[in-house]
Amino acid sequence: VLAECHIEELDYGIIDQTPFFCTCGIGFDAFISDRFAKAGKRGLLTYIENTLKEGLKYKPDTYEITIDGEKQVYKAFLIACANANQYGNNVYIAPHANMSDGLMDVTLMEPFSMFEAPQIAIQLFNKTIMSNSRIHSFQCRHLHIKRSSPGVIHFDGDPKEADKEVDVRLVPKGIRMVVNTQEQPYQPPLLQMFSEFYHEVNEEISTLGANIRADFLEGQRRISTVNKELLRKLRKKP
């Protein structure tokens, strides 16, 4: 790579005066980043465990976002600002994001039910999240977010406490990097298994009878069972 010395000018972002290169965000992804940092152990399994444990209990916030002087109000599960197209580990939060187009891809995810969670997980892995009805997306260079109270944000997965008003902007072609032009996409076996398992879960949930769908407590129990089975399979994976 160094011998070839292929240099590209890439964009980077700044959130709350802190630079980021792939993604930053506010809401559930920032909340999980904070829990992950405090978990005492690292690794994909810890991240998935925290996500499954906290996902159904998390309370979405209401956000006022300003883009190019226009204000809009949303209740959102998360707001992700992407320079690159994924969080990492093949989880694509903004499949069309490009690190050299001079724009941030913003993905806003509305609150969703527990029955919708497996489908959202699948779509994050197979790059089809933009087709989900809970998703709003747009491009911009500058975004101002106002929430109800101060709280955690994240930059490239690292958590940080911030005020209730957060500013995010993109710096076009602000960094020069040596890149590998021969890099091939790679799907880790663990991630492949996780995606396949959630596909099985989604099929099971889609066949639940009307009585179970009407009974929230029973549905919640089944989802909890699914989560425990997922963690069991992950722990058995070499």
Which residues make up each language-model segment?
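A generic structural signal for short beta-strands and their flanking turns/coil linkers
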Residues: K59-D61, K75-F77, S100-D105, Q139-R141
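Glycine-rich, charged/polar anion/phosphate-binding loops
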Residues: E8, I48-L52, D61-D68, N89-A94, ...
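Glycine-rich phosphate/pyrophosphate-binding beta-alpha loops
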Residues: G25, D29, A80-A94, P159
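A residue-level signal for conserved active-site and pocket-lining positions in enzyme catalytic cores
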Residues: G13, I32, I79, V106, ...
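Short beta-strand-to-turn element immediately C-terminal to the catalytic PLP-Schiff-base lysine
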Residues: I15, S33-R35, C81, M109, ...
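Gly/Ser/Thr-rich active-site loops/lids in small-molecule metabolic enzymes
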Residues: K38-T46, P95-E116
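Catalytic core of DAGKc-family lipid kinases
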Residues: V1-F77
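ATP/nucleoside-binding phosphotransfer catalytic cores, i.e., glycine-rich phosphate-binding loops
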Residues: I67, V73, N98, L108-P238
